[in-house]
Structures are given as structure tokens and as C-alpha cells.
Amino acid sequence: MVTWIRGEGLHRQAKEWAREHVKRLEEVGITPKLAIILLNDDPVELATQRRFASLKARDVREVGGEAEIYELHDVPPERRTKEALRLIESLNKRDDVTGVIIQKPVPPFVDERALFAALSPEKDVDALTPDNKKRLLDRFDLDNDVLPCTPAGILELFRMYGIEIRGKDVVVVGKGELVGKPLSVMLMQLDATVTVLHALSKEREPYVKRADIVISAVGRPPEIYRDNPWRLTGEMIKEGVVVVGVGGKVDPISGKWHFDVDEKSVAEKASYLTPNIGGVGLATRARVLKNLIRTSYQVARLVVSSRIVGP
Ligand SMILES: Nc1nc(=O)c2c([nH]1)NC[C@@H]1CN(c3ccc(C(=O)N[C@@H](CCC(=O)O)C(=O)O)cc3)C=[N+]21
């Protein structure tokens, strides 16, 4: 029998925790405000990312904070990087904005590195600026650091369900900057044997078949993508494996979700499994709230100290 790994508990706890801290920050005159930037004009991505952005904004408002969503997908491609840089610089300067998310993926013609390099590291809710990213290679503290939201959310789920990572064979499918890459580094530090598979891997089946834990973070469901589609099904895994499904896309025409993991066939073999709805997505949003509170304190320290003028 499969045990479902649900994110609701983490999400509820994070909201309560964030609500308390919003009150404390208000005492020093700071209201957490999250700015989310959407740059992608691809219809699948726009539909998907709009959905995620509005859910995150709703969470922030529910705990007493504020949220703004900036959509830049109508700016002509040749000007989009420049406009995004101008927006990021203005968000960096504004004292009322305490956290920024540049929603991924950004379109291929946008200079993503330049955008993350321009973002103030203390407002970086995703821990994706060059310096924040590098810190992961040193060491991390799951409870106290601003860490990439989805990887940290997944580690919190493992902890909550008592799933051991030390010495386990873990396969991460996907090597994206948002999930696959940071998560594989974190798992390595937790003493797992980590294998990272991606579009150019020569073979995937034998690695997936022998894994104790499979984390699928691809986001190319066969219903939507013809080249390099990916879906994890029950035949591909061994009995008793732990499976975490991360990737998913909204079909812009039907509005329907399509996910990395075939829930039904995988549930027949897995010991633990995240549901496609109510699993990793909620754990991610829990972490967005926690990270926003932390960036808000970082900004509060800067803003408050800049108001103190000495003799
Ligand atoms: N810079 C950046 N930071 C991110 O954190 C980021 C990103 N880019 N790009 C896309 C992914 C994806 N992501 C999700 C957020 C919420 C749900 C979520 O709440 N899902 C609900 C269901 C959604 C629904 O009801 O439509 C659930 O799992 O139950 C899922 C996925 C954040 N991402």
C-alpha cells in the first residue's frame, strides 16, 4: 500500500508562522511585499506560470502581506532583457518590496544570467542569484537559510514522513537550475548516492529501475511535447521505491494539467508517492512564504539601519 506524501501540513504551518512574523515586521514598519516577474510568452508557459504566480500571490495576501505580479511578455523579444533589468533595478531600490521572484523558465532569448546577477541578493526569494546559488556548495541549514523553494520543500517532506536519505540511491530526473541541480547538490550533502539524468543521458531505464528514491523534475509531458517527452510509469520502477513528482504543465487550450508522473501505475508499486495535486506544489508554496519572511527581515535590517543617522 502506498503512503501519500502530502504538502498541506507544511503549507498550513508555514502560513501560521508567516502570519506571526508579518505582525512582528509590522511593528518595525515593514510589510512583506512579494514582486513576481513573468517574462515568458510561450502559451504553455504563460498559462502555467500565471497559475503558479497567482497562487503564490494569494498565499502572501492571506498571511497579511502584499503581492504584485509584473507581466513583461508583450515587450518585443529584442527589448525584453533590457526592460526586465530596468524593472529589477527599480524593485531593488524600492524599500516597500521585500522579495522578488523571477518566474522560471524565462524565454531562450532573454539573458537569464544577467537578470539574476542584477537582483539584490537580500531580496532573492528563490536563492538563484549567483552568490546565493554558490552558498549551496558550502553547506546549508534547512531550517534557517533562504534555499531554493522546491528542493527545500521536498527535503522538508522527506523529514516530515521520516524518509531516510543517507546512503540511499537517489535518481533525479532533470538538471534544471530551479530543481534538479540544487536538489542533487543538497542530496549529495545529505550522503545520498545521487544520479542525475537528463535529455542527453544515454540510458535512463537501468538507473531508474534500481533507485530507492526517484525525483522527477522534467516538465515535458508527452501530451504537450513531441521532442524529449518524459513520463515516469509503474513499469519503470522497482517495488517499494519512493517517488516524488515535480514537473507539470497546463495545456493552454484545455486548461488541463499534465504531469511527470503517472500517478495510478506508480502508486501500485511505490511505498511513498507525492500526489500530483497537493504534494510538492504545496510544499514549494510553504517555502516561498518562509523565504519571503526571511528576505523581509533582511530588507528590514537594511531599511531600519539606513534610517539611523549618527551624530
Ligand atoms: N523562479 C521560480 N520560482 C518558483 O518557485 C517556480 C518557478 N520559478 N517556476 C515554476 C515553478 C512551479 N511552482 C509551483 C508553485 C505552486 C504550485 C501549486 O501550488 N500547485 C498546486 C495545484 C495548482 C492548481 O491548483 O492549479 C498543488 O500542487 O496542489 C505548483 C508549482 C513554482 N515554481
Curated annotation (Swiss-Prot):
Q: In which pathway does it act?
A: One-carbon metabolism; tetrahydrofolate interconversion
Q: Which reactions does this protein catalyse?
A: (6R)-5,10-methylene-5,6,7,8-tetrahydrofolate + NADP(+) = (6R)-5,10-methenyltetrahydrofolate + NADPH; (6R)-5,10-methenyltetrahydrofolate + H2O = (6R)-10-formyltetrahydrofolate + H(+)
Keywords attached to this entry? Amino-acid biosynthesis, Histidine biosynthesis, Hydrolase, Methionine biosynthesis, Multifunctional enzyme, NADP, One-carbon metabolism, Oxidoreductase, Purine biosynthesis
An example molecular function term from Gene Ontology annotations: methylenetetrahydrofolate dehydrogenase (NADP+) activity
Gene Ontology, cellular component aspect:
cytosol
Give one Pfam family: THF_DHG_CYH_C
Tell me one GO biological process term: L-histidine biosynthetic process
Task: Quote the SUPFAM superfamilies the UniProt record gives.
Answer: Aminoacid dehydrogenase-like, N-terminal domain (SSF53223), NAD(P)-binding Rossmann-fold domains (SSF51735)
Q: Transmembrane region positions?
A: none
Positions annotated to bind NADP(+): 174-176
Kindly state the subunit structure of this protein.
Answer: Homodimer.
Homology family:
Belongs to the tetrahydrofolate dehydrogenase/cyclohydrolase family.
Reported function: Catalyzes the oxidation of 5,10-methylenetetrahydrofolate to 5,10-methenyltetrahydrofolate and then the hydrolysis of 5,10-methenyltetrahydrofolate to 10-formyltetrahydrofolate.
Protein name, please? Answer: Bifunctional protein FolD
Lineage of the source organism?
Answer: Archaea, Thermoproteota, Thermoprotei, Thermoproteales, Thermoproteaceae
